[in-house]
Swiss-Prot record:
Record protein name field: ATP-dependent helicase/deoxyribonuclease subunit B
Molecular function via GO: 5'-3' exonuclease activity; ATP binding; double-stranded DNA binding; helicase activity; hydrolase activity, acting on acid anhydrides
BP GO terms, sorted: double-strand break repair via homologous recombination
Role of this protein: The heterodimer acts as both an ATP-dependent DNA helicase and an ATP-dependent, dual-direction single-stranded exonuclease. Recognizes the chi site generating a DNA molecule suitable for the initiation of homologous recombination. This subunit has 5' -> 3' nuclease activity but not helicase activity.
Annotated EC: 3.1.-.-
EC class (word): hydrolase
Cofactor requirement: Mg(2+)
Family to which this protein belongs: Belongs to the helicase family. AddB/RexB type 2 subfamily.
Subunit structure: Heterodimer of AddA and RexB.
Gene3D superfamilies: 3.90.320.10, P-loop containing nucleotide triphosphate hydrolases
Amino acid sequence: MSLKFILGTASYDHHQALVTNLKATFQEKPQERYFYLVPNHIKFESEVSILEALKSDENDYVAASQIQVFSLTRLAWYFMKNTPYYQIPRISTAGLNMLVFRLLQEHQEQLQLFRGEVRHTGFVAQLTKQLLELKIGCITPADLTAMAENLGDQQVELAKKLHDLTIIATAFEAAMQKRFIENTALIDALTLFLQQQTLTDCHFYVEGFAQFTAQEQALLTTLMQQSEVQIGFILDRAYPNQQPDGLNFFFQAGRTYYNLYQQARLNHVPVMMDQMADSQRLTPALAALDQFWVSSESPGNRKLSPVPVADHLHVVAAENRYAELRYVAREIRRLVQTGHYRYRDFLILTRHLAPYQTMIAPILTEYEIPYFCDLPQTMAAHPLVSLLEKLLDVNLHFYRYEDVMALLKTELLIPKGMSIAEFRADLDLCENLILKNGYEGKDWLNDFDWQFYRFGSYQEGTRTTQDEALTERINGIRRYVQATLPPFYRALKAAKTGRQVVQVLYQFLIDHGVDRQLLHWRDQALAANQVAQAGQPEQTWSTFMQMLDEYVTLLGDVSFEEDNTEQLNEFKQLLSAGFAAAQYAQIPSTLDQVVLSESGMVQTKKRQITFMIGSTDQVMPDQIENTALLTDQDRQRLLDNEGQVTPLLNESSVGKMNAEPYLNYLAFLSSQTTVYFTYPLGNGEGTAFKISPYVERIRNHFDLTIQKIAAEQSLQSTETPQGSWRSLLSDLIQVSRQAQENQTLIPEQWLTTYRLLQQAPQSQFLTTQLFQSLNYRNEPERLTPEIVTGLYGNEIHTSISKLEEFYQNQYAYFLKYGLKLQERPVFELTPANTGNFYHEVMDRFIKLIQGQQIALPELDDQQIDKLVSEVLAKTYEQPEFKILNKTARMGYIRQQLMQTVKRVSLALRNQSLSTNLRPLATEVLFGQVGAEKGLQGLNFMLDDHREVKVRGKIDRIDQLTINNQPYLGIVDYKSSQHSFNFRDAYYGLALQMLTYLETVLQDQQAILPANSAVKPAGAFYLHLKNPTLTLKQLTKKKMGQLQKGEFDQMLLDQFKYNGLIVNDEELLENLDTTLVNGQSPLFAFSKLKSGKFSSKQLVTLNQLDLLMAHNEDLIKEAGQAIFAGDTALNPIMRPDRTNALTLSPFKSIFQFDAMLPENNYRQLEALDEKAVLERLMSKKGDGNLE
């Protein structure tokens, strides 16, 4: 028979030449068979094109039963569909992975390099791909053995790799024999089958390939021996006697020509004279691009005179990918509206579509452009896949919160009789309670119901009928899980083989209606005319069924141990890997649509305009990395040792890089008239991109101007607006906002656009809505008196910390305490929980020693340890601290908390040996807190008979008596380092200590009834911690203490009291009775050699009065502002740039943007204690600071 080549560069129409030849032969021999072979993904378009070409001038219809357009695998179906071989089951990628997984386990003792790799994620899939590459390249296990024998002594690792590949490949071939067919084996089988057939009446026309695998070349050799074969190559000339140099621009096509030519000679097949495609398919501009590109990539490239290409070559730089894709959509729509183009005339190409994947649908939908994206979409994200993974994870991780919720949120397991809306609402309630109480593990399996309670300052734990109803709904979900999953897991545990595991899983899914729910989803998608989505549920279920069949066939007889947890995990991983490799079959929904694809995929040549998007130096040329088991170095070593076999492997990274100019050349010339090169200048996240060197070379040669596209429409643009009504509305809003900011008029063309959008029924409502946003200012409105009264009444009962929050940000106060918004409660140990724990323990500890009438200085270490252990045991029983008993991690944290409490208790004892200050009372209430009352609260009358009542709880009140003069001080426990900040006190951010001190002084009779003239000692912070010392902190004095074993004394200054201290010499002497001079280890002051005391924390009684008076003013001013309805969005900004927004849970509500003129931080000045006191004295009108 014969072989004929159709050659020519990309400028020429190889398709037309082949179809013309086919048509001529068909008219001469209409009874013979004709096959047009193309890559699979362009088969449909090629068939349509060929049928169009075969129509006669007189008849619009053509009967072409003798003409078939096939891919190579479809050709196998055509010839072999009725043979016994073709009836053997196909094996999927998932099945291949399962088979390779089994082979690795069976042969692990023989393996040298791969023995321990089976457990590594991704290795099985990587090995499977390598085996398929060897099979496609027709490299047998015997070839691998020969390769290994030819390696030198220095190539030990490669020899081990080939040794293991030989073992697995041999076992792979044996396991597949007559049991399964995988797609690559079909080509071999077809070749063998056709060798036994008569094909003299057949004609084969091959187009769209630049190279063939070894399998495909063997098939073509068989075809040319028995039939007429014509192959079209984009190739500048013939290479009958010698393949081109590796750096030759047409290397791939030239090498393929040479190999096929040599096969024809070897098999005595006549080679017809080459036919040069002579029909120019490109405009002169693109033909000039063809000449230039080929010339520039060829040695000694000759100078070419540029031709006018302005209307057919464009280079466009957009601000980001979003602006780039919007420009492409706008341009396509503009060109279609000229009436000269249809949507099917456009092709959008890029090297990798992934960076654009999230933008394609919204932008093209906005511009009302029908499109088809031929990027394969995997099934990994389908809810069925998540259901299967989480169904097994719940068992593997024993009802972990994340797994149970993910399982239920697939919405494939729903209680019978419950609507999807009811299920979602109940599941949300259930999840909230789970997060609040930390339910997981055995909590799902207990017999008693979970209880829903409301807790808060305004709902004191009282249960209502509504609470009971919500409790029932929540437990409906819990009972469903309890009734559904445990029986399934018991059945899984009882399974003895892989086959039984599959039976249990399949029956569970059928019994619970998963298959019916998937069909329901399909019907919903069809009803909504979502054709692509409608096919996904059935395709995913079908893939799953095939994987189960393959698992049973390959691993069904594998025994499962009694504790089969690890084997079930492997089963889950095999399913996950299978779905990750499985892809949806994609069907174009219409003929007239824009196609998006990647430049590495072959395209038909009938389109008019190509947009090469993403033309940056990152991907053009692409940065190629070889991830196969046989690395580039391995391939080079094999090439050096085994030159005949190695070329049958896939190209190395270097070979693929060398092919980049040719691959992009095909993409540049994929359409007939025009090409747009577009690229983003950045990714919108700070990364800048450069133009592709390929495009830069083209631009320089043809002297093209780069068109710049901004992210937003320009106010100065005079162009007529283009786009759909939805895209025009987006652009109009941008232009209007710019005009508003620049205080200029909107251009006339945009005013016209506005009028049209307002008149059109489909756009009228949204236009009105969006234009309202132009007048929106991100600033809260002042509350009306009615709303204020409704929220707060006429009395504000508040803790002082709430008012501190008001001074941090008024709007945050309104959200939290006016609207009572709160974050969803989560079962975790927060800093607040830790603080409550410390407060509870210290309260119990002080009250215990007071109740037993034990003097703190008299306690020894053993007594303290016993007392602390008693206190901790009772504290752990409190419901709010049950989290400490929940997990092993919490157990560790509990140990740390216990060590801290013991260390603090020892520190209190040690401090008591050096001070006369003694704890008097702990956790002292003032004002009304819930149903409890304590000391008299601070009440402040405001205008309009309104009142602020401050309440709270003082951690500890200490007492000291000097010469019958009682002193009272307050102590506030902190879990982090604190000191009194005069600036924060001045701005209302630190009201607590002064308020507590004023409360104690105000109600001193209730504290010390027998005394009438109590003086303040100070207000102190105590940092509760288990301290560690750095080397820098180990002074000579501390080293001496350490050597003497005085460890407690060495750590004494780690528990120093910081805060306000009254500057009273007699008082200070009694606060630290052992201080001779230097820094006190107990309090934040030092004693000079002169006998005087020094500290920035010292204040006189007069200064303390000033601070407390200012504190009162701040409380009253906050109350006045709250009752006035002030809700300003005014977060504070400290001099160190920390601000009130950093940790706020309401940031998504604030929408605070410092770039907006109405959003401003309230800047705090950097005031020290002297500056604060001076301002307070000035406010009082007294210049005396003492």
